[in-house]
C-alpha cells in the first residue's frame, strides 16, 4: 500500500510560505505584549506600597524608573487654564479627562495634573467647565509615563482659547502652549491624581488597555490559525486525506 505522497502546487505553497510565518510571528508578538503588560502590572503593584515623595526628592530622570512612582505635590492650579483629553469613555459614557496646570511651590516647575473624568457633549459643541480648587493645595498621585509616542488622528491644534481640547498628552508638544501662561518649566510627565484629593473628579485609572490574559488569548488564536493553515496545506498537497479515509474504511 502506497504511503504518504506529496505534490506541491506552487501558488498554494507560495501563499502558505508567506502566511504561515506571519501568523506565527503575530502569535509570539502577542506573547511579548502579554509579558510587557504583566511587567507593568507588577511594577504598579510594587509602587502602591511606597509612600508619596515630592518631585524634588526623585533622583532618577529615567522614565522607566519614574513610571507609577507615587508623588506628593504642593502648589496652585493656574485658574481657567486646563486641558481636556478628548474621547475618554467611562461606563459607556462619553467624556473628557481634565488636566490642570499646577505650579509647584518648591520649584520653578509646572505639572500637568490629570484630575480625572467628566461627562461632556458627544457632539463636542460645548466644552465642560471644570474649575480647579483655588489657593494652595497639597495632593498625591502617581507619575504616568507614556509607553510611546501617541497615535493622533490629525494634527493637534494646541492654541488658546482655554480650555484646550487635546487628543493625547504629549508634554513636549504641549510645552509651547503652557509657556503662553507661565514662565515655569513644564515637568516632562503628567501626574494622575489619587481619588479623594483636592480637585479630583471621577478617578478610575486604567492601567493597561488589554490584560496579559487577553494578549495570551490573542496569541492562542494566531497559533491556532497557523496550525489550521499548515494542516489544510498538508491535506491539499498530499494524499493524506485518502490515507485517512482508507484506514477508516478498512477498520
Protein language model annotation of sequence segments:
Residues 62:
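Phosphate-centric recognition/catalysis
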Residues 1-58, 69-251:
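Surface-exposed, charge/polar-rich loops and edge strands
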